[in-house]
Amino acid sequence: MNKLAVLAFSILLLLSTILWYLANGSLNEYLKSQIELQGHYYSGQEASLLRAEFSDNTNSAQLNQLTLANLTSYQAKNVLSVDQVFIELSAQQNSSLLTKIDKITLNKLIINIEENKEGVSNIEQLIQIISLTLAKDYPQSYPAISAKIYAQEHPELDAEQYAKNHPEVGVITEHTKAKKSRGKAKPKMMIAAFNIKELELNITKKGITQLVLKQNITVNNIGGTEGIEMNQIGGEILLNLLKLAQN
């Protein structure tokens, strides 16, 4: 495996910036810190990872004990937890700007679903938080949400009149389209396969908890064939995992 692929992999999953390998530091510690930082960035909640271990001999990594703290207004300590994550990096990296992940496997994913007095669940709130963050950072991927944000930030606009004069185009289109990148092209990542061996849903409504168990859950390809910016991958993964609680 070439060194460039190792460097790209060090910012896998939940990452905020493109940093190259630090000669004086540990790749495993760096990966761990980036996962925790990105978990917090997208959800606003504390993300914790016990250990990250990357092997350049097998082009793979293993993450142990990954948790995301629950919203403070709910009872469960964590909204989700994963005991082990296995990551298989593609042996063939055709481009220095696109890192390909063959497969990510979660051994056991636990999601705690709770509703407040108004009937709104912690999952709904977190999905909204993550979606809004993604829409602000990557409006071209979330045009509908981005358009709502734009309208809220510009209350002087007459939404109804605007819709009549500019159906699905105009200012909103201009606002949501990708901005031209300045300087070097940004590295991207794609995940070909995403599998969850065991999914445990703890659903609490009106003080009563129901346990639902599912096995061999497949999440859609993330990043398509061309990949998406590495900074975006973390939010997309969180969003996909939380949406499993709604299916």
Predicted regions and their residues:
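Secondary-structure transition motifs
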Residues: L68-N247
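N-terminal type II signal-anchor transmembrane helix
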Residues: M1-S43
